[in-house]
Amino acid sequence: MNGRRKLNMQQNKRLITISMLSAIAFVLTFIKFPIPFLPPYLTLDFSDVPSLLATFTFGPVAGIIVALVKNLLNYLFSMGDPVGPFANFLAGASFLLTAYAIYKNKRSTKSLITGLIIATIVMTIVLSILNYFVLLPLYGMIFNLADIANNLKVIIVSGIIPFNIIKGIVISIVFILLYRRLANFLKRI
């Protein structure tokens, strides 16, 4: 019975930690920074960092849960734009799954950095394709913006690609700075 109680306690602590990371990620969605020379609707926030912390501490399912909860809460509180949270979830999921897949085989600083670089590239490609075929046409349809459909290539090349590269680099740097300091603490909670 004592072993079962200890296992339940560990599972509860893990669930609480994932919940806290989800809450932190949600709060971070409200702290946004515009990137000069890019369209004003493309703003940078650090809400993917808690998802990455959850992924690299507890595994990819935990990271996906944090990203999903963050974006569901963001949608429920913004009550308007379903496309933004959906795109953010896809960006975060493609980023964290790629980074973790590369890192998990050889857990080293080099594989971590390599994983984050490749994750930035994958996220940029995934979001460029999704924006071209799904997200931007959906925005155009929902908000009745005909200009979007006529300028997809320009929007992708001059906005989406540079934004996702910058986002991947910034998120990676912040994550690297925090991960080494917080990983052991998060595992002990």
From Swiss-Prot:
It comes from the Bacteria. Residues 1-9, 57-58, 105-107, 183-189 are cytoplasmic. The keyword Transport applies. Residues 45-56 dip into the membrane without crossing it. The chain crosses the membrane at residues 10-29, 59-78, 83-104, 108-132, 160-182. Coiled coil: none annotated. It is a multi-pass membrane protein. One of its GO terms (cellular component) is plasma membrane. The keyword Membrane applies. InterPro entries: ECF_trnsprt_substrate-spec (IPR024529), RibU (IPR025720). Residues 30-44, 79-82, 133-159 are periplasmic. It is found in: Cell membrane. Forms a stable energy-coupling factor (ECF) transporter complex composed of a membrane-embedded substrate-binding protein (S component), 2 ATP-binding proteins (A component) and 2 transmembrane proteins (T component). May be able to interact with more than 1 S component at a time. Mediates riboflavin uptake, may also transport FMN and roseoflavin. Probably a riboflavin-binding protein that interacts with the energy-coupling factor (ECF) ABC-transporter complex. Unlike classic ABC transporters this ECF transporter provides the energy necessary to transport a number of different substrates. The substrates themselves are bound by transmembrane, not extracytoplasmic soluble proteins. This is Riboflavin transporter RibU.
